[in-house]
Amino acid sequence: MCELKVHVDTPRGEERVAEDVVYAQVETEHVLLKDVLGATYRVSDSFISTIDIGKESLSLTQSSIVTPFLRFLEACQKVETTRNYTEVEESWSDLKAKGDEIARSLWKKYGRSS
């Protein structure tokens, strides 16, 4: 069996979050991980960026925009069956607001390049 070491790339750098992981699932607010002993780990605001079986590693990327993006994607998929567009509009508004917040923060930190 192949067990994976899991790292997360954050704005602060790379951190190891789990070892001997045999299960990973992207959920709306986190990535759920389970190791060979059944212990569970949740990494918030993240998605799976790389799986490298040869190196027995799984990499996650963490950002505050991931959850609003996944909520928007989920709403878009759900509207096909529910025919309720309201949730799409609300989640799109939330995603744009989070994107604006991140862009403003980066602009304050680095300014505009000429």
Annotate each predicted stretch with a short phrase.
Residues 65-110:
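Charged/polar low-complexity intrinsically disordered segments, enriched in acidic residues
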Residues 11-18, 89-91:
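Short low-complexity stretches enriched in small and charged residues
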Residues 112-114:
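Long, compositionally biased, intrinsically disordered regions
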Residues 1-15:
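Eukaryotic proteins' extreme N-terminal regulatory segments
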Residues 15-73:
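Compact, glycine-rich, soluble single-domain proteins
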